[in-house]
Amino acid sequence: ATLLFLIGIKYIITEDAMGGLSRMEVTELMADSYDEEVEVPVGEKMTLMLVDGTKIVANSRTIVRYPKRFDGDCREVYVKGEAYFDVAHDAEHPFLVHSDNFRVKVLGTRFNVNNYDTSDSQVVLVQGSVELKTTNNDRVRMKPNEMVNLQEGGFAEKRLVNTDEYTCWMQGMISLTGESVESVTQRLSHYYGVTILPDDKI
């Protein structure tokens, strides 16, 4: 459940209730449940340590919203952009990462989320296990070294990957192995916040 605090009154919105809301409405409601918001400057990275011991490394232009403390049955945060999560284990309080087009549910694990573009998002699992739920109500369970592609609010693909290629941005590198020119320019555009167009001659 997502806890919303408005004028000192606690409201509980269940998953079923949220399922009937639009993507924009869900995002607006969830924004009210977080005390803190950070937006990483262009070209920089930021490390956040949450009160439960969870570590978040956020990439350039990423927005992260989180509470000062976790009071409910679940630990919930919101992310828009790209972030790596090292979640502190707590079997009684699952950790939920919300975005505009999917949700990741974990107990304790390490994974990378990339949703700069909500029409084409990725989740890469480094360690542990997670369950994804999309705005289309698709559910996908992941194992380590798997990547899930999400398109237009639904599940598109799951495959094995080298997770280092998707987390090396934390060391200031970008892996472009096997990517098309269009994919490369899109990633650089997201990172720097500018429009980069490929040369037709390439």
Regions found by a protein language model. Name each.
Residues 3-202:
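A residue-level detector for the "anchor" residue at the start of short, highly conserved motifs
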